[in-house]
Amino acid sequence: MTNTRKNHPLMKIMNNSLIDLPAPSNISSWWNFGSLLGACLTLQIITGLFLAMHYTADTTTAFSSVTHICRDVNYGWIIRYLHANGASMFFLCLFIHIGRGLYYGSFTLLETWNVGIILLFTVMATAFMGYVLPWGQMSFWGATVITNLLSAIPYIGINLVEWIWGGFSVDKATXTRFFAFHLILPFIIMAXVMVHLLFLHETGSNXPLGTPSDSDKIPFHPYYTIKDXLGLLLLXLLAMTLVLFSXDLLXDPNNYMPANPLNTPPHIKPEWYFLFAXAILRSIPNKLGGVLALFFSILILAIIPLLHTAKQQSMIFRPLSQYLFWILIANLFTLTWIGGQPVEHPYIVIGQTASILYFSLILIIMPLVNLIENKMLKW
């Protein structure tokens, strides 16, 4: 009798990706976040679909339609808050997933890493456009400020911004196109996730030791399916606690005021997951310089494989690199805190110092320390 799971053209792909996949026997809970990201993406697409059924992409009715979802639609409030806080869960998992890749040297799987960077940019673009849709004060002014950054591009900047706006300011055309993009991008993300997994399964997963694990593999199911299901349970617990007890904890109160082009909020800031980038952007007094720093603060991930000068892949046996890695994480926390503060005396200097340290650690200090550790292997 033929085994359908192993022979059916469609089931064979699923089987080789999720059931009979040979996986390293020692991957820790830090490897759970890939599946959690998949769960977050699924949640966002499902809740987003239901929200799109009731939302109207028009400046006059967008704010009211979101209010209508929360008040009149059956369980609309939970769908809306699952979607809003689901984005926070998504980015939390995303940052941990990238941090894991940096710590354990997963960036040596070049294709997987590069597709991951493209995914990060796409998810960030999607989240930004989603934040604009409720058409509250912070939505409107966030859209104005961020799109305006493109005007720093020499020669074509102003034309580019007006082309994106669909007019001379953020208006009805902007809301409509942002909704269209926000709707289509998650499906593009899904396609890129398939490519990400395709490249990952070509090489196999990295392991905490950073050594080849071909000699010691175990089937993905049941060992890692049960482990992933536990991670999912904990994520669901965190998400539901957030949604049901303090749904607005991570949001901005200004977004409960309808957009008013005549009244600028005292402090325009993005959601928490973009604050580190906002702090880097603000720390440079020049507009073009700030935009470039913002862009390269994320694109810098692409050159990390080139800066990897260590003889060992993982940081597990490199105490100095570990120390610098945790300084980098603390620095990112500092940048996130600074991004949420007003632009005044102590915060400006702290932000500039943290921004310089961020780039210095990645570009100069860590590669040098890697070389020192290589020398230490001979002592």
Curated annotation (Swiss-Prot):
What are the GO cellular component annotations?
Answer: mitochondrial inner membrane; respiratory chain complex III
Q: How does it sit in the membrane?
A: Multi-pass membrane protein
Q: What is the protein named?
A: Cytochrome b
Q: Which cofactor does it need?
A: heme b
- Chain positions recorded as heme b b562 binding sites: H83, H182
Lineage, top-rank taxon, reads Eukaryota
- Listed binding positions for a ubiquinone are H201
Gene label:
MT-CYB
Q: GO biological process annotations for this chain's record?
A: mitochondrial electron transport, ubiquinol to cytochrome c
**What organism does the record attribute this protein to?**
Varecia variegata variegata
Give the main localization category. Answer: mitochondrion
In terms of PANTHER family, this protein maps to: CYTOCHROME B
List the InterPro entries: Cyt_b/b6_C (IPR005798), Cyt_b/b6_C_sf (IPR036150), Cyt_b/b6_N (IPR005797), Cytb/b6-like_sf (IPR027387), Cytochrome_b (IPR030689), Cytochrome_b_C_euk/bac (IPR048260), Cytochrome_b_N_euk/bac (IPR048259), Di-haem_cyt_TM (IPR016174)
Q: Which residues participate in heme b b566 binding?
A: H97, H196
What does the note under cofactor report? Binds 2 heme b groups non-covalently.
Q: Which CDD domains match?
A: cytochrome_b_C, Cytochrome_b_N
Q: Name the job this protein performs.
A: Component of the ubiquinol-cytochrome c reductase complex (complex III or cytochrome b-c1 complex) that is part of the mitochondrial respiratory chain. The b-c1 complex mediates electron transfer from ubiquinol to cytochrome c. Contributes to the generation of a proton gradient across the mitochondrial membrane that is then used for ATP synthesis.
One of the entry's Gene Ontology molecular-function terms is: ubiquinol-cytochrome-c reductase activity
- Please state which protein family the record places this protein in: Belongs to the cytochrome b family.
Protein's cellular compartments: Mitochondrion inner membrane
Its organism's taxonomic lineage begins at: Eukaryota, Metazoa, Chordata, Craniata, Vertebrata
Q: Which UniProt keywords apply?
A: Electron transport, Heme, Iron, Membrane, Metal-binding, Mitochondrion, Mitochondrion inner membrane, Respiratory chain, Transmembrane, Transmembrane helix, Transport, Ubiquinone
